[in-house]
């Protein structure tokens, strides 16, 4: 909720140069919990405002994308405010998000104890500084930090840049020693599945898909989807191949293949 409002504000202040859309980066979660706090899921349960079990932001985004674009990219010479100088567009965007997501509670009771979002976050013992974001690209020096240049990284969260082989060594070590990993990828990649497996099929070696253009997951036929959930030839990308895919737009926003460990 708060991240949506912050992103809308950034989009309007930059006249649309900052994108406003669904999604974001892992840094949004870290920034959000330290800045705004946390609440138990039952306080703002996904889908609770429209009797569903999971969040479905399609309709919400259709409304708010249009609202933010009308202000950020419109031809209005002056934006309206109320008697307290609060911008009316902000109040309107916040109201729509509250209708679809719920109103963030100022206080709530959890297991017999009263909390605010900030005090509940503090009670968890979580620290944003315990998490680190890693990436691997050659257009910045290795062993330095930089904000990955994708639209969803609009808060300019920093990532440590490692050579690809070291990047994977850290990944494997994190798993083997019990640390948590969040891997940034996207459901429109051909190797995405909802069965707990992600692969990068080798188009040339996967004979069962011979003649296919490896359409995005949502366009694959059921029999084609099954091919991504069983062992098959995979492509092991080199540093140069990874960089080229980023540079030529083959893998861009939402396809950052970034991970964070703690």
Roles of regions detected by a PLM:
Residues 261:
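Conserved small/polar residues in nucleotide/adenosyl-binding loops
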């Amino acid at each position: 909720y708060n991240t949506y409002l912050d992103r809308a504000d950034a989009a309007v202040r930059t006249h649309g140069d900052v994108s406003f859309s669904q999604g974001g980066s892992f840094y949004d979660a870290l920034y959000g919990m330290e800045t705004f706090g946390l609440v138990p899921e039952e306080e703002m349960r996904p889908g609770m405002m429209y009797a569903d079990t999971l969040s479905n932001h399609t309709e919400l985004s259709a409304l708010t994308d249009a609202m933010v674009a009308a202000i950020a990219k419109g031809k209005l010479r002056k934006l309206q405010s109320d008697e307290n100088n609060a911008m009316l567009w902000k109040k309107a965007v916040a109201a729509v998000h509250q209708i679809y997501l719920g109103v963030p509670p100022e206080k709530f009771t959890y297991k017999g104890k009263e909390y605010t979002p900030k005090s509940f976050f503090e009670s968890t013992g979580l620290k944003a500084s315990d998490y680190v974001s890693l990436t691997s690209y050659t257009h910045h020096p290795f062993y330095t930090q930089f904000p990955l240049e994708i639209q969803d990284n609009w808060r300019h969260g920093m990532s440590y840049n490692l050579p690809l082989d070291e990047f994977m060594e850290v990944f494997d070590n994190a798993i083997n020693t019990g640390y948590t990993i969040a891997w940034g990828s996207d459901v429109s990649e051909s190797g995405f599945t909802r069965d707990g497996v992600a692969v990068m099929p080798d188009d040339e070696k996967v004979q069962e898909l011979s003649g296919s253009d490896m359409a995005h997951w949502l366009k694959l036929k059921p029999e084609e989807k099954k091919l991504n959930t069983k062992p098959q030839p995979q492509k092991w990308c080199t540093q140069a191949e990874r960089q080229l895919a980023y540079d030529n737009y083959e893998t861009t926003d939402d396809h950052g293949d970034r991970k964070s460990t703690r």
